[in-house]
Amino acid sequence: ERQIAYAVKNKFKEIKGQEIDIGKEYLEKLIQYPIRIPRLNSKEMEFYMICLLLQKKLDTEKFAELIDYLNEQKREKFLDFDVDYELLINFDKDIADNTRDEINIAKQLSPILSAGLNGNPRQCKRFLNSLSMREKMASFRNVELDRKILAKIMLLEYFKPVLFETISSNLDDKGRSSHIREIENNDFQNNKEYEDDSWVKNWIDVEPSLAEKDLTKY
């Protein structure tokens, strides 16, 4: 809405003598029933991510059946509903076995994505699309990536680009980062600006640990 209002203001001159916000007036004429996308909390973000990831994994008919099953389970177990292996195995064992990675990724990322994106589902979908694109590009180059490591690295790139650049430009000859090792050990001597940064500390707690990983290809 802000982008459209800004574009209208730049296109059309204000009417002299009239205190009219031309951008706002235009939007009110154009959009009769504005729909606000609600923010998602951590559990809602997790479920949303699981649905997006499984949609890419399953054919249309099977995905629709799974969504019906999950919605039914959600109604029955509203307060303690959780999508996990045990829930999926009751639906289809093959699907449960083949989607473990997707479920784990959603559980890994949802808390920090929910906080970092303020529960915005559109930006969450954009992040997952970027993750998928990175994987496809790596596959095209015959490079095998660990999705959990890639996702964690992308979180840093997305939310803390300065720290990401510091880490990526200072890898040792084995592709390891001394900055990550220090931060994982709660040593902020060389990264004092992040000592009280709750986001960075939450990011460090996300599995897997990266201190001894070769990050060169990420």
Annotated model-derived regions:
Residues 39-218:
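The feature marks long, low-complexity, polar/acidic/proline-rich intrinsically disordered regions embedded
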